[in-house]
């Protein structure tokens, strides 16, 4: 390969026009695979030398050249040229300049099809390792915050209406469970990512006596693809990642939506650190939860990346097709988005101020204790449906009078049902309502403590 001559140019009488070439080039984004491409090439050439397909001296020269190129890339001494088409051609051109025609032996028993598939597996494995660590830290932040707020009480909502008072720690632990499931999904995703397609060649394997198990071992893969067609055609592991990322972003978006509400003037449940807020160019008083809004907004682009690749893959015949070039930008974008978003959310949570009294006061001027009264009557042998009807009438009456259940005089309670005693007022407090929810997984303080203890054990 001389100058910018294509790796595949021998069969053609003339080259592509520049604008067509630019349309087909992927170097503007697949340069992000450079480290992984060089790592895979070093493993491949080491195997070629070990198997006697090329001499060990030749393998060592090629390996040294690749290591030099990697250093040049890290030091930003290499300019990525769109005429190279992709990162593989860039590296091979650089290798040719460093060691001469011997560079051509690197591609022995290998195709760009298994080469790029290997790069993608290595890249995503790297991303998953980083993401799982970040999710672990986010979960630790949630557990620590939940432990601080086991006895902090706020309204629980259904339909965004006050439903029942709950522990703020309980609320936080709900998100801990979501992010734990996310972590489990990404761990399973790793199983399908931690596989080596290297050696599948274009689609049918190779006639050379390669050792695929050796290259898999050198690259740290746990398993081989056992069908060469599948090896170069498979993008399931990327789709799984994008689907899992969509679920993760959905969970973060839901949390951020609540944070946005909680920081509003109407709620004032929490205040975000200045480090995660911005202001207004015209309204001096504003402190906006922009980072939470951006996580909510960026969820849409992650969804889009998932559906984009699903659509690319839906009608592709085996094996490799140029359509598969479209697997990269969405993956890179999603990976970069979620890695930062997880850090942002962890940072917001670990630095935000929780206004306990405001949360508690929000449970005092509502009817979120109505279920307590219904349960109170049911515990005195009244059928729950009858109790529900009676309490509903009391809520209606109190609403008309501008009072709440705890404000109703005992004589009026007894007029509705003689089963109601003076102890009803203790039952109707928000704290009692929370403490009495002692079923497994409930919001009772002891149950929240149990959830946290289980989480601590899981995180250790």
Swiss-Prot record:
* Pathway(s) served: Amino-acid biosynthesis; L-arginine biosynthesis; L-arginine from L-ornithine and carbamoyl phosphate: step 3/3
Which CDD domains has this protein been placed in? Argininosuccinate_lyase
Q: Spell out the reaction equation it catalyses.
A: 2-(N(omega)-L-arginino)succinate = fumarate + L-arginine
The UniProt record lists the EC number as: 4.3.2.1
Q: Enzyme class, one word?
A: lyase
Which Pfam families would you find in this protein's record?
Answer: ASL_C2 (PF14698), Lyase_1 (PF00206)
Major subcellular site? cytoplasm
Q: Name one GO molecular function term.
A: argininosuccinate lyase activity
**GO cellular-component term (any):** cytosol
Any idea where this protein resides?
Answer: Cytoplasm
Q: Name one GO biological process term.
A: L-arginine biosynthetic process
Q: Which UniProt keywords apply?
A: Amino-acid biosynthesis, Arginine biosynthesis, Cytoplasm, Lyase
Q: Does the keyword Lyase apply?
A: yes
Q: Which domain of life is it from?
A: Bacteria
Which family is annotated? Answer: Belongs to the lyase 1 family. Argininosuccinate lyase subfamily.
Q: Any idea what this protein is called? A: Argininosuccinate lyase
Tell me the gene name: argH
